[in-house]
């Protein structure tokens, strides 16, 4: 989902 993608991006940024 949308939030899943956001979480994935945040995880990639190290946040």
Curated annotation (Swiss-Prot):
Record PTM Leucine amide, positions in chain: 15
Question: Which Gene Ontology terms describe the biological processes this protein takes part in?
Answer: defense response
The record's principal subcellular location, in a coarse class, is secreted
List the keywords (alphabetical).
Answer: Amidation, Amphibian defense peptide, Secreted
The Gene Ontology CC terms held by the record are:
extracellular region
Q: In which tissues is it expressed?
A: Expressed by the skin parotoid and/or rostral glands.
Cell location: Secreted
Q: What does this protein do?
A: Caeridins show neither neuropeptide activity nor antibiotic activity.
Its name, as the record gives it, is: Caeridin-3
């Amino acid at each position: 989902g949308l939030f899943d993608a956001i979480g994935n991006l945040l995880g990639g940024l190290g946040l």
